[in-house]
From Swiss-Prot:
Family matches, as Pfam families: RNA_pol_Rpb1_1, RNA_pol_Rpb1_2, RNA_pol_Rpb1_3, RNA_pol_Rpb1_4, RNA_pol_Rpb1_5
Positions annotated to bind Zn(2+) 2: 818, 892, 899, 902
Cofactor(s) demanded: Mg(2+); Zn(2+)
Name of the encoding gene: rpoC
CDD domains attached to this UniProt entry: RNAP_beta'_C, RNAP_beta'_N
GO cellular component assignments: DNA-directed RNA polymerase complex
Similarity-based family: Belongs to the RNA polymerase beta' chain family.
Protein name per UniProt: DNA-directed RNA polymerase subunit beta'
Catalysed reactions, as listed in the record: RNA(n) + a ribonucleoside 5'-triphosphate = RNA(n+1) + diphosphate
Matches recorded under SMART domains: RPOLA_N
Annotated Mg(2+) binding sites: 450, 452, 454
Record-listed Zn(2+) 1 binding positions: 60, 62, 75, 78
Gene Ontology terms for molecular function: DNA binding; DNA-directed RNA polymerase activity; magnesium ion binding; zinc ion binding
Catalytic class of the enzyme: transferase
Amino acid sequence: MVDVNKFESMRIGIASPQKIRYWSFGEVKKPETINYRTQKPEREGLFDERIFGPQKDWECACGKLKGVFYKNQVCELCGVQVTTAKSRRERMGHIELAAPISHIWYFKGIPSRMGLALDMSPRALEEVIYFASYVVIDPKETDLEKKQLLTEREYREQLLKNGFGSFVAKMGAEAIQDLLNDVDIDKEVSELKEELKTVTGQRRVKIIRRLDVLSAFRKSGNALSWMVLNVLPVIPPDLRPMVQLDGGRFATSDLNDLYRRVINRNNRLKRLMELNAPNIIVQNEKRMLQEAVDTLIDNGRRGRPITGAGNRPLKSLSHMLKGKQGRFRQNLLGKRVDYSGRSVIAVGPTLKMYQCGVPREMAIELFKPFVMAQLVKKELAANIRAAKRKVERQDSDVWDVLETVVKEHPVLLNRAPTLHRLGIQAFEPVLIDGKAIRLHPLACEAYNADFDGDQMAIHLPLSEEAQAEARLLMLAAEHILNPKDGKPVVTPSQDMVLGNYYLTMEEKGREGEGMIFATPEEVEIAMRNGYVHLHTRIGIATKSLNKPWTENQKDKILVTTVGKVIFNSIIPEGMPYLNEPTDVNLTTSTDDRFFMDAGQDIKEVLAGIDTVRPFKKGYLGNIIAEVFKRYRTTATSEYLDRLKNLGYHQSTLAGLTVGIADIPVVEDKHKIIDAAHKRVEQITKQFRRGLITDDERYNAVTGVWRDAKEALEKRLIDEQDLTNPIVMMMDSGARGNISNFSQLAGMRGLMAAPNGKIMELPIISNFREGLSVLEMFFSTHGARKGMTDTALKTADSGYLTRRLVDVAQDVIIREDDCGTDRGLVISDIATGKEMVEPLFERLVGRYTRKSVLHPETGEMIIADDTLISEDVARKIIDAGVKEVTIRSVFTCKTPHGVCKHCYGINLATGDAVEVGEAVGTIAAQSIGEPGTQLTMRTFHTGGVASSSDITQGLPRVQEIFEARNPKGEAIITEVTGTVESIVEDPATRTREITVKGKTDTRSYTVGMADVLMVEEGEFIHRGAPLIQGSIEPKHLLQVRDALSVETYLLGEVQKTYRSQGVEIGDKHIEVMVRQMLRKVRVMDNGSTDILPGTLMDISDFEALNETALLNGEMPATGRPVLMGITKASLETNSFLSAASFQETTRVLTDAAIRGKEDHLLGLKENVIIGKIIPAGTGMFRYRNIEPLADLTNAPEVEEVETETVEN
């Protein structure tokens, strides 16, 4: 028996008739399944035990031989071999077909492989196979052509004319088989290659396609005639089961019906042929057999699908593989697993970062085998069976054992949809009463979970290795940073933010203002006894606070508030005292203006200091990031728990509530509204007089109401009272934003109609005043549209993620350094005046490609091939450097992956990336996960300036990654040179731009409404846009090189995401874009044996040319091809990965013809065949580590081992 997990690769091919017979354990001759009286399988039927194996383990059909003793013996009564019933899942049968039958995949697929092999049109093939025409196989001496089609009538005429036997013509798949047998592949290939040198146009394309198929057959060793079946395999019966329902009826797999149709027709055909029936009857039966086999292989591919009960099309063999419910996606890529459960989640505010609460009755079921083993070990149960009974009875000792078993055994919690890797994290279980899983409040953001009825699944890692990995790599306390941008993902929210905001507020003139304390303990006593308030401004001796003071701050008195003393008491030692929400205070030290000498009057000092704003949500995130940067995970997760507890405690003490009286009233709201009404009347009058168009009127009216809403909003912000609880919630970032506030206190404003257009009638009321019936009706439109948009967007975004993961799943960090000499020059990404992504963010965590010098002094800031830290990046920016050359994924030479230096740091840990990290999947998740936050709409820019629609949001991201022609396309120049002239032509409402290059001059026509990006006399490089809009990347690739296209696409994706406030690290987009440009199309094959027009991986192409050059031959030339992610996924080298993605039958047909070998480099292929994935700890270099023998203790170790075995 081969070891299932040891093979290197997997090959697929076309099965020869001999192979099918070799697989088979016997011929299925009858369409019968089960005898309805005895409930036993019929002999020679579809469930025959003699062919497929016994239904019960170690027992023959008649019951004569029972037990393992008779292993592998064949019963002489019933002829059944004694073996396990599992063999019914493995043993195949076969049907000997009475006539050859064509395989529908090879005849009907696009392009028709049979047609290309024979140089016949698919239509001609169809006529022959389905007995509509004869095809000439051997014309002999007649004037007929080989492969010429003859109708029944022409055939008879030719027979009369030339005599019987003067030529050979046949019908059906038999004819096709004869023709396929006649093809001499080697001869055809050499003839076609000769012809290829001279022809052009359509004929050339046709020849290349034929050559492709023929050379595929030649290389793979498949015979052309195997595309026609003489023997049909029958799959094992347990894969097409038949089960009895209560009531004596049977439910059966559709395949059994399909097989029965084939067997019935095959048997009838045999009988007709034995009887020498008239030719027409036999032909009809053959055609019906052909159709039956077609239906079995792929129902509905040709003609109308065969339906079963209730007009449902039957599921054929092809449908078993296809789609979400097919074998690949349903059973191979995702399986249901044991040792799992699910329940509703509730908040666990008392838990530590690394803990979760697991209900006892869930835990007892999950940990059952562990508990049973412990019971036996502790001699609380005699054997496993007794232990099992004990657990089922839930005896009292079971619970104590459970406590010990659960200790330090991490569990995995997963919330669907799992959009990124933080959707599954490990926690240490804490047993609780009740039935809900308890989740740590800070883990919510990563899971995107809330407690309004969300459910979560729980899984148990079983083996020691799995537990170790869960503990070391997946523990929730380790996941402080978000892999997409390297920012903290566990920032406090809601109550925690509110409590800390309230704690750090300052108020002038609160009780006890100006008191000076010696120690923090004194402050606390004073507060407890009501001498001071949390917000009171006080002084405290710096020497009592264990903080890194500067020299001139020591032995002074710090002016701060009571709350801030408490807030700073939980911050790790070594961090500065935080007295104001500034970056300087956080990274270096507290500002000197907050310090006074012991003799000074504190009242005077306080009068000179303005009140400081409290700490909001964003600043808390900065503090966490700084703590992480200094102390890494353990200290950060401890600090987070302290911050959480403090926040909850203080918000409870603060007791903030909201009532209708807390919503402020804008006194002169009616004035603003009246002014708006007047302005709208003026606009309407202008329109009536014909001074403005209807579009202009519409834009002006909506503009007026927008301005009115903004004016009210501005008033609310200017007049807001910072002690108002609603304002506090909003200002702190705990809940709500200015738009919610302005709808409560200002006006609701304009609403969208069902068609997405904005209605001119605004909602003037706010929620405090209450809406009128009409206003309420209008708001329902917008609300309903919002809901549908969200639902559609989620599906779209999920599908985008699936395609992204598929195209990048085999990108893994495979080596330390690829040694490339190329790099990527980067600078700020900006659109016009607006900064999209500053250079600083693009530098941090990357390696340099060239050393960076100070522009003025010329001294070296950082050497070549060195990691850029935040501090160095800050130095580079401060020196005024505008461009830096860095190592980039785009220029990495590692085949099938990336190297450490081209990738840089792993954003999730802040350290250098490890070999084995699955960066492709992480990149795909980082781009897909925020997809739901992008808008669905394609924005209309409004106004007259630019009339074209510019796609934005999710549709734009899809457009970029699918490499489609963009809407609102920008015209680009194809030459480098100077803009000579821009001439307007009022008659045609166009402008002509002339660009003069060194060798030639080009002219481009653009519309009057287009916004120009160039001016006369400007020097531009080829590929530069002349007008505003999106460049078509495929056109850019023709004009410039691949790197320019990659850089452009990177910038475009960043613009789309950043405009919506989503930050994503460059490297993730680089990984995805590189996958779109992995292929080269061969233009001229030189002296290599590759076909022109072939798509090849860049690394394979370069290796091929290297070999050619070493042998002194002509290398091939090719041009890079830009593919959309769907196309790129289907063109991957792994047929398993492509088949499980989309177009399963097409991918498998093609792979079978080529005899493709899958080297199992990616993640998907290995998941499908059940091998450990070649990433992370499953990587080859980590799995084959032999422990070094320590020879000094060798004998003792052996003894210990034998003892454990005996135990």
